[in-house]
Amino acid sequence: MMITLNASLILASASPRRQELLRSAGLKFKIIPAHVNEDHLEGETPSKHVRRLSRDKAMAIARQYQHSWVLGADTIVVIDGMILGKPRNKTQAKNMLMKLSGREHTVFTGFSIINSGKSVCRTNVVQSAVRFKTIRRDEMNWYINCAEPYDKAGGYAVQGKGACFIKSIR
């Protein structure tokens, strides 16, 4: 079932995972990726970081489409107080996954919905504790040789092949 909104919905992201979530909810939407500086600001907590980025992404698009609802989101993985970004190569992916192997880490996702024409901005952050099983060498090699790790925070996706490493989520 498709739900039609009076005002259009715009996803300020090119993320296939976010697109699939909206489609599975039966929503019609346009995709207009936002390009914002994603650098971590000094002294910024992980929660404030994803909150700011989700708002910045939504606002960057909402300024141009004042009568639309714009959804922005950002996800980061944090372990030992360190933010793990998106690995750019096999070495980075392997190092990230070795750091996560057999341990618990925290995933922060911020999301913002903005309609600048109505002066509406709502932002929230969800925090999840994820425990990985110990990753065997053959599993590691298999995973870093597929395309999945390279466009995801922490080098894995809970809804993808990386789910095989997850022991628990709370």
Question: In which residue ranges do the predicted regions lie?
Answer:
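Catalytic cores of phosphodiester-bond-cleaving enzymes
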Residues: M1-M2, N37-E38, E44
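Anionic-ligand binding patches
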Residues: I3-L9, R23, T45-R170
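N-terminal G-site helix/loop of the GST-like fold
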Residues: S8-I31
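Cofactor-binding loop segments of dinucleotide-utilizing enzymes, especially the Rossmann-like FAD-
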Residues: A14, A34, S116
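Flexible, glycine-rich phosphate/dinucleotide-binding loops
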Residues: R18, E38-H40, V120
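A short beta-strand-loop structural module common to alpha/beta enzyme folds
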Residues: K30-D39
